[in-house]
Structure formats: C-alpha cells, structure tokens
Amino acid sequence: QGYVCTQKCAIDSMLWVAQKRNYHPIVEFLENLENDKSIIEADINKISSTYLGTALENDLANNMMKVHLIGMVRRVFERGCKHDTCLVLKGEQGIGKSSFFKILCGEDWYCDTLNENIKDLLLTIQTCWLFELSELDGYTTKKDAAQIKSLLSSSADNFRRPYERITDLHARPSVFCATCNRGDFLADSTGSRRFHVIDLGGNFIDLDLIKNHRLQILKAAIIAYRKGEKNYLNSVDQQKSTLNNRNYEQEHPFMSALYNWTTHNANRIEFKDGFTLRTALIM
C-alpha cells in the first residue's frame, strides 16, 4: 500500500522472476527417463529397421536415425550445439510419417507450422523440440531451398522476445525433421548433404508400436549421448548419404533435352571424342 508500480516496473519484475525460476520440462522428462530403471532401452543401432521396417542390412538408415535421436537429446542438454542436418522420411501419403515424429517427441513439443513471419517462426523454434518441415517436396524453388538451408545451418537465432526491449541471441533447443511424398524434393544439390533421407516406400509405420516403445527409444538416445556418441554421420556414411541424395534431386531442364539430343543423333554423330555444349545447342 502506498507504492506505485509502473508498467515498466511490472514487466521488468515479471521477467526477473521468470528468469530466476526458469524451468525446462523436456530436461526434467529426459532426466526422469534416464533414472527410471524399469525402462529398458531399445537397440540404438537398429531403430530404423525395428520400428520403420527398413532392411536390417541397411546400416545407413539405422545410422541416420541414430544421429537424429542423439541430436534431439543433445540439443536439450546442450542448447545451441551444432546439429545442422535434417532427417527426412520419404514415402507414400498416409503411411504415418508425420505421426511417427509427433509420437516420438510428444505432441506438446512438436510443431509443423512453417510461419512466413520470420519472428513468429524463430519464436516457434524456441518453444518446440522437434520441428517438422512437412511435405518437403512442396518447397521446390531455389529460394525455398536457400531459406531451408539457412534454417538448418543456424544453431542460434537473433530476435526480440515478447516484452523484451532489445534483440538478443537465443540458442536453439530443437532439431528439424521432414517428410515428403515425391522423389524430386531436393532443389539445391549444394545443400543436400544436410538431408538424411530414409525411403519407406509404401510401408506403413506401426504407430502403436512406436507409442508403446517411445520411452525405450528415447532412453537409448540418452544413453548413447551420455557415452559421447556423435550426432553426425562419420565420413563414410556421409558420402553414402550424399550419393543417395542424387536420387532425389530435381532434374535440370537441360538434361532431358540433352538426353533426347544424344539419343536421336546416336547413329549419325561420333561421340567417342566427346562433344561440346555449343555443338549440342546448335545441332
């Protein structure tokens, strides 16, 4: 009684108390899971083959899933750590790709809304654990590819939060994933190394199995993280992934014309010494 509290004073007090008593629900969730002896971890090296139905001998798919899961855990415990790759589930529509990601991280910590307003987008990235780029094959232009490449590359974002007066650098707590149907979703070959593609074809994901084994999967990722396992592919697997991504790159419009030209002229032109682009264009 007798004190006058201005709006500025009230806001500053609210922010001070919030910062002093900050709370991270995902940290608490993972720490409780880690200490729960009743939960037996899944095999971190076989998550894709066990739960997505990829071939058991497909080590690349299993390894891509493994580094994604470790990256999820690491971003929680080491906010803003380097994790510039995106796990992509490719397959027919309706097989449960997005539902897999939503179940995995929990609906409250999942987002698939790519806001056009950059500030809203950066705020959303700060409040989720898994951000899905749904229907990745819809982002077909070079501009789209550049924006997504920029999003994946950053480990912190500079913006002003609500009620704050100045911009500040905010380390990221979340990682990206993606889903797609078509096979030509990579518009920029220079940035394709960031996409780890697991091709499911038309295989339906057993979502009940994911729900029942979600905690085992996440606990396996926690244990792997605690052991110091990496959230990125080794050089051999990265080369395999980059080579595999060529199957999903958009064809340059000149390539089909060049193919037709070489095919139609195969009987009347000697190609053994090669040919120049000028020759192909003129003839």
PLM regions and their residue ranges:
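Feature primarily recognizes SF3-like P-loop helicase cores of small DNA viruses
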Residues: G2, K8-P25, K82-T85, D112-L114, ...
